[in-house]
Amino acid sequence: MKSLLFSILLIYLIQLVRSEECTDKHIHCFFWSQEGECEVNPRWMKKHCQKACGTCSLTSPTPLTRQQDVPTARTFDDQQDRQFLPSRPSSIPEGCNSVMTVEAETRRIFSSGQLTARFRQQMCAEEQVAPDCSINQCFHKKYRSMDGTCNNLQNPVKGAAFTAFTRLMPAAYDDGFNTLVSASRRNRPNPREVSVFLLSSERSLPGHVNSLLMLFGQFVSHDITSNAAQNFCGCQNSGPMCASIFAPPSDRSRRCIPFTRSFPICGTGQFGRVREQLNMNTAAIDASLIYGSEAITARSLRFAAMLRTSMIGGRMFPPNTNPGSLTAGDGRAILFVGLAALHTSFLRLHNNVAARLQNMNRHWNADRIFQESRKIVGGIVQVITYQEFVPELIGDASKTILGAYNGYNPNVEIGVLNEFAAGAYRLHGMIQETYPLVNSQFQEVNRYRFIDGVNNINHVLNNIDAIYRGMMTVPVRSPQRLTTSVTERLFGGSVDMAAVNIQRGRDHGLRSYNDYRRFCNLRPITSFNDWPEVPDENVRQRIGQLYRTPDDLDFYVGGILEQPAAGSLLGATFACVIGKQFERLRDGDRFYYENPGVFTSPQLAELKRTTLSWVLCQTGDNMVRVGRRAFDIENGSRAVPCSSITGLNLEAWRE
């Protein structure tokens, strides 16, 4: 009898041990199983996600060592011995009974696609309708809305998606309210002529930082700006929305560059109401290009606490629902191969954070985990922007222009400036002709042309690490001239970005270069021969041949030609305007990461330790070494192991 009982007990214990040993070997197994990956990729999932796929059996071989639920070596620095307060402040906002994680809909919501279709039908863009922030006040006290409304509780649409770009100075149109500058008065040169004669050059002057800076700058641009424009005008069209650029007779490479004006906000551009343009993205730096700038898109990208993914080769990517595309919160995710890589990295970062929070705070529901993860990722993007990107872009003047942070100011206009979006931040001159693909030993293994990486995700699906390392090794191009890749060969040669940038500035009513010099307390130029910021006499002579007087000079042209200031990639005028914009995005954002109460003190300390290098280590395919400072030019000699790159410890979020 005793031996029988012993045998039964032994069998039970063996079953128990084996059932415990049947584990998921990856942190995202449950999420992938819910997405149908057990059926789509059965071989890989059965090997790595037995428990999630329900393929455990007593006949399964017993692993020699217990596999851990979550990766530990390279994920988050929770092994490091850092002390956190034993009792944390309440996460419930003041005046609320609980943490509200869902924003109740109080108005009809449209997707970006639906709104764009309406704009095309009406030939004008409707602005966002202000919600009643008091209805969801406990949600708004803790989390951002998807469309940016109620960031400013006194003015709910300030900085929200689908609201007007703002201005530093009143608009300038030929007729005072609608017609492009120089369209009727002819006081400025043909944009294509300016591009060919002045701005386009195959000569590349290296900047002091690497090409990741260009890439991250584009990432930030797509986070905070999306112009309501559609390219439906051909060169044969002459309607009120069309302003195509006809090349001068001497231009042998093309006859015309199609150009469609940005949709005006409905009711503007008419006598008595100056034409204004719509920003379809949230103004705040909030990672909206990952999550979407309105609720419908956001819901389509989300599964419970996670962001939806496609598993390709055992790796996570943004949904690959159509061949050759990736679906993200912004429709321009695959505009360039490097941009698609960053979309992939920050999607992986969200899902890594969400999985860790899910394991750490099992009492949190999916909405709480999603909102906290989104808040953390948005905070990380802000940290990289203000601690790494802006100082390298603007240089020594960044601290003076932005000033010290003194907390949230609801009176600051957070909206994106027309002068920024349609002028100073159009830094296509940073783009190089070609980029290398570099292996883990920092050896070049292949090279691709920039134009071949446009709307092409093949390199991303193969190895995003090689893309990043290639960007690290190549100096960013000084933006004072544009490579012929973007003036002569982009999109099959149909687009000249220099000419388009000039025309877009005129379309958006930007004033002259001298007007913005005065705004920035810089001496306006009275003669092209007396222009210290442009020391090249040949360049000044060419400008004089194109423009009649300095007061006619386009803001974009004058700003981009300025010699970079100390430690900067930009001249003084562009540095001023871009600095003012980032100051507004910081001071006018109630959820800016340093604003007291947005994060606890331990959480804030952890966020400040994150860097772009850390993000690349956490989210690469198998990133082994990086430069400690992501924007420093790196040939491998100073690269350090990813294990030495410190970053976020999520213990500060344990409840």
From Swiss-Prot:
Positions annotated as active site in the UniProt record? 222
| Signal peptide, first to last residue | 1-19
Question: Which keywords does UniProt give here?
Answer: Disulfide bond, Heme, Immunity, Innate immunity, Iron, Metal-binding, Oxidoreductase, Peroxidase, Signal
Q: What happens when the gene is disrupted?
A: Knockouts show increased susceptibility to infection with E.faecalis but not with P.aeruginosa, increased levels of H(2)O(2) upon infection and a slightly shorter life span. Fertile animals show a bagging phenotype due to embryos being retained in the body and an increase of clec-60 mRNA levels upon infection. 50% of knockouts also have a dumpy phenotype. RNAi-mediated knockdown of the protein also results in higher susceptibility to infection by E.faecalis but not in a decreased life span or morphological changes.
Q: Which reaction does it catalyse?
A: 2 a phenolic donor + H2O2 = 2 a phenolic radical donor + 2 H2O
* Domain spans labelled ShKT: 22-56
Does this entry carry the keyword tRNA-binding?
no
Which tissues does it occur in? Exclusively expressed in hypodermis.
Annotated GO biological processes are: defense response to Gram-positive bacterium; determination of adult lifespan; innate immune response; negative regulation of gene expression; response to oxidative stress
Q: Where does heme b bind?
A: 428
Q: What is its EC number?
A: 1.11.1.7
Needed cofactors, names only, are: heme b
> Where is the site Transition state stabilizer?
332
One Pfam family it belongs to: ShK
Q: Looking at the keywords, is Metal-binding present?
A: yes
Listed under GO cellular component are: extracellular space
GO MF assignments: heme binding; lactoperoxidase activity; metal ion binding; peroxidase activity
Q: Which cysteines are joined by disulfide bonds?
A: 22-56, 29-49, 38-53, 133-150, 520-576, 617-642
Q: Which family does the record assign?
A: Belongs to the peroxidase family. XPO subfamily.
Role: Involved in hypodermal immune response against some types of bacterial infection. Probably utilizes H(2)O(2) produced by the NADPH oxidase bli-3. May play a role in cuticule biosynthesis.
| Record's protein name | Peroxidase skpo-1
What's the source species for this entry?
A: Caenorhabditis elegans
